[in-house]
């Protein structure tokens, strides 16, 4: 399996060559671009600044130079991956101060992460002619941190509600008070509230045509009332409160507009409506708005980011100067070429093709895998890793597996556990088998083996349209005062519960029969019976309006399909559940390694969690039909 490619016309390296595959790998154009050393002449008025940059090892290419020099008016800088956007952002700040004689306090730099903000501040302070004292008055921070300072300047003294677990506890309490404890996922409710705020939608703006929509508005309203009562605000409130404040306080807005004559924004493709509206207000007077981003890297729509903002920027600002940073300094031509080949099929994008900076005559080529199913896929990846580690060319920490959703990681995790390979899953709060969609199905199987498993019973109660708390309280009381006969199970207690509708009793009887039936089946047949047969679990997910309100049908089907695939190799429930318990235990053990930067572990994460990170060896899923690519 040769991964080094010294030739441009190297055939594609396939694990299994698919029909009608192209013969050669897509290669990005390689060039050695002109730089400021050739482009900036000695008689140029700003040559002194670029000569100082060069002495510090900062050499800009033609497009980067264009972006730095274009200081007036709206500028859209389309920065492809690895094209040096941070160098441009920082060099441009230095240019404004050194060449244009702009005071640092008249410059605002906005980023999306604290780490990025700190890096930009540090780099600016190291620029020629500048120091930490010089840039002390420069405002550089995240949208939230800058907006928070604006709010504090006007007397806002709210406590910050930043802990996600704390917010979930609040929502759980609200749901319990409304008698909806088992009906909504708190995490999803919070995501919907956040999305609404990022779109600047108030509670009154939301629809209320169905009972579920009215319930959501009530949950939303109670959450806001709790925060106001306890004097809290969350991160989304910082955006909304700043937007409202600037709309209401014209004097403050004018003061900020006068101060921030030049505004720079990083990762502009991740901007949401609330952030953009505030940005437009701040830049309204001088319109010196410099935004850097890449619409091809817009992957946070589910959090409220809108790619339309970067796509329509030239329409919002008709005299926009567009600069395309199209030279990748990070990756080799075969990887950049692969990215170009895939992204060109996007319909909504600013047209651009990345080129490569020539650094060597030797190039690594992607290794393509075409597995037949998820199990084959996982085995191929894990064996590929083990081969490298055995040969001494890699360590476990060199590998990362990227995927679209955590459901896809199930088979990979299983193989890593079976082969005793250390791993850490980033970004997911629950393992696949503990997911709220998956767990009830498994608990039906657990109950078929042990009908008196109270923990398993808890998760299936909502599928019988029973209130979990009331049912468990009744059962635990009955277990003390009215023990069951030997032929009875916990489900028989439910038949005696007062206030049951005849249809509920019939459903409980059907579930007792179901448990008897699936006990004799293989795990995969049992799951199918629970999902689409007598268990009617899929129907339950569809007709439960509350669940369908917060759950995409495609996502639920993907999770359940993956669960079916996980059961295929097992002949007995015992072997299947033993493996699941082993995997869950391993997850707990591996969690302790998550915060250890020196741990030698394979990393697993979604593409969203991986943004901005680098690894020596990457496995990534393109999409169905399954195609895994190893990027060295």
Describe each region flagged by the PLM.
Residues 3, 22-54, 73, 94-246, ...:
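A basic/glycine-biased coupling hinge at the interface between accessory DNA-binding modules
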Residues 56-72, 274:
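N-terminal pre-P-loop "Q-motif" helix
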Residues 317, 360-365, 393-523:
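ATPase/helicase motor core of nucleic-acid motors
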Residues 44, 48-52, 273-371:
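Conserved RecA-like helicase ATPase core segment
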């Amino acid at each position: 399996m040769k991964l080094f490619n010294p030739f441009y016309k190297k055939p594609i390296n396939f694990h299994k060559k698919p029909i009608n595959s192209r013969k050669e790998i897509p290669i990005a154009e390689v060039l050695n671009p002109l730089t400021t050393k050739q482009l900036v002449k000695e008689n140029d008025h700003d040559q002194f600044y670029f000569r100082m940059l060069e002495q510090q090892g900062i050499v800009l290419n033609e497009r980067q130079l264009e972006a730095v020099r274009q200081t007036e008016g709206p500028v859209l800088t389309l920065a492809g991956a690895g094209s040096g956007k941070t160098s441009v952002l920082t060099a441009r700040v230095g240019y404004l101060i050194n060449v244009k004689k702009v005071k640092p306090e008249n410059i605002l730099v906005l980023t999306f992460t604290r780490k990025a903000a700190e890096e930009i501040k540090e780099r600016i302070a190291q620029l020629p002619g500048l120091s930490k004292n010089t840039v002390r008055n420069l405002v550089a921070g995240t949208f939230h941190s800058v907006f928070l300072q604006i709010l504090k300047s006007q007397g806002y003294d709210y406590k910050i509600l930043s802990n996600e677990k704390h917010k979930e506890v609040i929502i759980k309490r609200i749901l319990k008070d409304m008698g909806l404890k088992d009906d909504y996922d708190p995490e999803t409710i919070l995501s919907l509230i956040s999305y609404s705020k990022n779109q600047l939608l108030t509670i009154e703006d939301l629809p209320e045509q169905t009972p579920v929509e009215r319930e959501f508005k009530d949950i939303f309203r109670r959450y806001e009332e709790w925060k106001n009562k306890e004097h809290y605000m969350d991160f989304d409130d910082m955006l909304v409160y700043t937007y409202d404040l600037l709309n209401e306080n014209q004097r403050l807005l004018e003061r900020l507009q006068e101060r921030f004559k030049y505004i720079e924004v990083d990762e502009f493709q991740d901007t949401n409506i609330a952030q953009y509206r505030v940005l437009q207000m701040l830049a309204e007077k001088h319109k010196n708005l410099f935004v850097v981003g890449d619409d091809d890297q817009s992957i946070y729509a589910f959090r409220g980011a809108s790619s339309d903002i970067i796509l329509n920027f030239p329409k919002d600002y008709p005299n926009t100067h567009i600069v395309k940073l199209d030279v990748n300094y990070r990756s080799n031509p075969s990887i950049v070429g692969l990215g170009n080949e895939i992204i060109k099929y996007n319909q909504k994008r600013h047209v651009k093709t990345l080129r490569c900076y020539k650094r060597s005559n030797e190039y690594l080529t992607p290794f393509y895998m075409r597995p037949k199913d998820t199990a084959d896929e996982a085995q191929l990846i894990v064996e590929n890793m083990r081969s490298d580690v055995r040969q001494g060319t890699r360590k476990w920490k060199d590998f990362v597996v990227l995927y679209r959703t955590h459901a896809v990681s199930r088979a990979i995790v299983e193989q890593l556990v079976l082969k005793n390979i250390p791993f850490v899953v980033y970004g997911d709060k629950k393992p696949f088998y503990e997911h709220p969609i998956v767990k009830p199905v498994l608990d039906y199987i657990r109950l078929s083996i042990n009908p008196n498993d109270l923990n398993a019973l808890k998760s299936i109660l909502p599928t019988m349209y029973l209130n979990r708390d009331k049912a468990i309280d009744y059962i635990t009381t009955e277990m003390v005062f009215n023990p069951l006969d030997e032929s009875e199970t916990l489900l028989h207690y439910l038949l005696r519960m007062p206030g049951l509708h005849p249809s509920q009793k019939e459903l409980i009887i059907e579930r007792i029969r179901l448990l008897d039936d699936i006990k004799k089946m293989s795990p995969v047949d049992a799951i199918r019976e629970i999902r689409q047969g007598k268990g009617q679990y899929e129907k339950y997910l569809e007709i439960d309006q509350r669940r369908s309100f917060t759950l995409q049908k495609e996502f639920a089907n993907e999770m359940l399909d993956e669960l079916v695939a996980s059961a295929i190799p097992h002949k007995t429930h015992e072997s299947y559940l033993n493996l699941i318990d082993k995997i869950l235990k391993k997850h707990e053990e591996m969690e302790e390694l998550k915060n250890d930067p020196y741990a030698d572990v394979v990393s697993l994460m979604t593409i969203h969690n991986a943004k901005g990170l680098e690894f020596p060896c990457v496995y990534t899923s393109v999409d169905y039909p399954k195609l895994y690519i190893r990027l060295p």
